[in-house]
């Protein structure tokens, strides 16, 4: 994977038969059937008009077929999900027509359908990437009682699996959030104020501001759950993704000056944030398993939030064999796992 603007894009070379896109609200991911992947930040709510041209650029290698899954339809640049699906499908049609490729959209029932069919039933293709990912996880787990825990930048998916795929309690976002299968917390983008009401800083417990001065990313940077990346400015304040900058952002959450908060203080605050987040995910895990009445025999970990997933599993009391998807398919592919899964589905690589 490369950062946007660093040519050549790895997918623009000729030779791909299928190019799969996973279009989120904050990230754009792609994979082809040869295992090449691409992931970049793409703030859809700010750049919806740029989506079609960007997809066309990534498809410049002229694959015969483009397939797509999405979660970006919920972005608040769209009045509702149906409009979001229409906007994303229109952008995909722009890309497909620019290279005379077929276009297929992934449905929540596991089928890949035409753009016309997707537009006629937009909610059947909304928020569908988790389903494709669960099929890949099920194929790798080879168990009738596996549990998928996928922690991404924004959300966490908790899905019971059998050998055929997901055994979900619900399929749409609202139903999945009500069942506990979708937890709107992630390792990077969740505002600290949405996780805790106070932080232990500078010798006392302090209330936090109801502002997005810091995100979960800052806690996990300080704890080593995310690597430092001084070149990345995809942070709450646009500063670098470093531990020292994370310390400053956490200090700001309690309206303290950065000089008043040492590194040890900041780490203690980060532990509190991480623990609260892990408790939230652990409660959802217990709820999903209780609803199914089944105890899993193994766990599949997906996404780049493995540190949060591991802490949550410990909180939930699940000491089980674990399959890390990044070890099974490689770290780059794991970061774009729904797109990788969809490319495999489209070519018959997984059932």
Regions found by a protein language model. Name each.
Residues 1-25, 31, 35-148, 159-351:
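Nucleotide/phosphate-binding catalytic cleft detector across ATP-hydrolyzing
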Residues 151:
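Active-site activation/catalytic loop segments of kinase-like enzymes and analogous catalytic loops
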Residues 26, 154:
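Conserved Rossmann-like nucleotide-cofactor binding loop
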